[in-house]
Amino acid sequence: MSLVPYFFELSGEHPSLPLADAYGCCAAECDGFRLSASGPGYAVLGFEPGKLGGIASRLALTRRLGRYLGSSSLDGSSSLAADLELPSGTVAVRVRRFQGCNDGIDLNRLAAKIGGIVARDRKVDLTSPDVELGLFVSDRVHFYLREAEIDRSQFEARKVAERPFFSPISLHPKFARAVVNMTFAPRGGTLLDPFCGTGGILIEAASIGVKVCGSDISPTMVDGCIRNMEHFQLPYERMEVADIGDIGSVFGRVDAVATDPPYGRATSTMKEPLGELYDRAMGSISEVLDR
């Protein structure tokens, strides 16, 4: 199996979740993959090129990704650029800095310098280029081919205010998607949310082709979750009113579990002490997992 390195331009919205999200997507989509490097705002993961589309379609906390070409210091960037073997066609150089890293580097000058090198034998097209060369300024200058950009507006379209049934206590869809990805749930596999609430996690799982089951001790929440799934025209396997202790007998074995459990404030624990509820939940979840 030949693994090709890909550069992930992470969102930087959390210190560790973006990397975990990218790693989870690769684990779910690939028979084999490898994390070879990571740093401020980026990760390099190797996988088969045919898996790129599937990985990109489920990412939540990555902005862009594509074939990794190499990294250098500012002084070494010209040499690296001169040695690149880019695909044929018009080219554009896109430069981005991660959160103030290497702030002494002038991004416009860097773009002009590298653009002048890679465009010596081809035309520049800044509007609709055949090849987009990404330069990501972080701990070093990282070069990659921009091959996929994540449509993050999709998460805004599914946020709480856009649902017919909602609770003010709910994960933002992009973080709900990241939680799903971190379970390594494969497309076609079954994911259970035993505290489904309004269905935010199940919505994100179903939207990437994972089969979903949900339960909640509140009939109102289960009905509302079904309304939300139907609103977004997403399929579900089963939705049940069930106590966390009964999920094994209700659902049997599943491939993954993802949930946002009650916090004991605005959400209901049916007067059960939070610690006891969590202890029961961990026991029940371990019983239903297939791995």
Protein language model features and the residues they cover:
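Short, charge-rich binding segments
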Residues: A82-L86, V124-L126, F136
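An N-terminal amphipathic alpha-helical segment
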Residues: S72-P87
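Active-site nucleophile-His-acid catalytic modules used for acyl/amide transfer and hydrolysis
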Residues: R96
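Short secondary-structure capping/junction motifs at helix and strand boundaries
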Residues: T90-A92, A119-P129
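Class I S-adenosyl-L-methionine-dependent methyltransferase catalytic core
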Residues: M1-L65, S71, D75, Q99-G100, ...
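Active-site periphery "cap/insert" segments of enzyme catalytic domains
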Residues: I114-G116
